[in-house]
């Protein structure tokens, strides 16, 4: 009777602790994850490019795929500022451009000739900027097109012109592509002469030593011992993990000890049966030769 009551109590305690484990363990897993969203709504190709750059620079980053086909880049919260600076220096994420279909989509209203002309010039600028941005080593590009409204009755026409601004990696030999870039712009705009296209190249150079120094500075600032809530959470998570481990170990050892104590108590309560005889009866084959 005593052994049965003891077993019921142990079973009740164990079943009562199970809900606590189911709540504590997921909470600890959630707290141990300190990654935050860096950029969202990214296309897969651009997200992979950003992920590779971050990982090559020593940043622990992951890409999370969304249900809508876009991707999200997540990094450690301590390296959020460094990750933003690193990607901005490489022109990532890239600027989004509108195409001709998006600019001239039906609005239901009759546009004036001036509005249609403005849309056309803007569409040319967007398309050319997008094309030049796809060149390897180009971080960002802007194309400004000037199409003067010439009067057919006036003799002297003002020629069209275009200005191109390119921000690129200094390691890329982009000046060698300058004639091709000017030809690309001139051939894309009707009536635009080659010598009326001006291109401004701005190289961006950052030495490897400066890059490592910036990373070391951000890591030092992120890991310095300051009494911030984030540090308190990290210490609390570590303490909670240690406490839960000890708690589970204590439960296992205590349960085993209570089983052995119950077996010994039941053996001692049996009248006329020695402990050795009970053990031999409990384990068949013991003492047989």
UniProtKB/Swiss-Prot annotation:
Signal peptide residues on this chain, from the entry's feature table: 1-33
List, in alphabetical order, the GO biological process terms annotated in this UniProt record. protein secretion
A Pfam family assignment: YscJ_FliF
Lipid attachment in record (S-diacylglycerol cysteine)? 34
Give the membrane topology, semicolon-separated if more than one. Lipid-anchor
Location(s), subcellular: Cell outer membrane
User: For this UniProt entry, which segments traverse the membrane?
Assistant: 233-253
Per the record, lipidation of type N-palmitoyl cysteine is found at 34
One cellular component term (GO) for this entry is: cell outer membrane
Keywords for this protein: Cell outer membrane, Lipoprotein, Membrane, Nodulation, Palmitate, Plasmid, Signal, Transmembrane, Transmembrane helix
The UniProt entry, under NCBIfam families, shows:
III_secr_YscJ (TIGR02544)
What protein family is recorded?
Belongs to the YscJ lipoprotein family.
Q: What is this protein called?
A: Nodulation protein NolT
Q: Which organism is it from?
A: Sinorhizobium fredii (strain NBRC 101917 / NGR234)
């Amino acid at each position: 009777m005593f052994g049965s009551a003891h077993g019921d109590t142990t079973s009740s305690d164990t079943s009562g602790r199970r809900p606590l484990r189911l709540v504590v363990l997921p909470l600890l897993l959630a707290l141990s994850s300190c990654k935050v969203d860096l950029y969202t709504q990214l296309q897969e190709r651009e997200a992979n490019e950003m992920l590779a750059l971050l990982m090559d620079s020593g940043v622990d980053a992951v890409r999370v795929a969304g249900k809508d086909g876009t991707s999200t880049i997540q990094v450690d919260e301590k390296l959020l500022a460094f990750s933003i600076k690193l990607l901005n220096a490489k022109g990532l994420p890239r600027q989004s451009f509108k195409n001709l279909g998006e600019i001239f989509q039906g609005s239901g209203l009759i546009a004036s000739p001036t509005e249609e002309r403005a849309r056309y010039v803007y569409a040319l600028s967007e398309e050319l900027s997008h094309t030049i941005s796809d060149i390897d080593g180009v971080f960002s590009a802007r194309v400004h097109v000037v199409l003067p409204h010439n009067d057919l009755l006036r003799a002297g026409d003002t020629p069209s012109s275009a200005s191109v601004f390119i921000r690129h990696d200094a390691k890329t030999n982009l000046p060698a592509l300058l004639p091709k870039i000017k030809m690309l712009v001139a051939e894309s705009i009707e009536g635009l002469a080659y010598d009326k296209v001006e291109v401004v190249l701005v190289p961006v150079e950052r030495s490897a030593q400066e890059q490592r120094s910036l990373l070391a500075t951000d890591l030092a600032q992120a890991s310095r011992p300051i009494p911030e809530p984030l540090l308190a959470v990290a210490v609390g998570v570590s303490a909670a993990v240690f406490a839960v481990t000890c708690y589970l170990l204590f439960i296992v050892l205590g349960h085993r000890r209570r089983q052995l104590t119950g077996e010994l108590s039941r053996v001692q309560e049996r009248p006329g049966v020695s402990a050795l005889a009970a053990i031999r009866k409990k384990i068949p084959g013991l003492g047989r030769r």
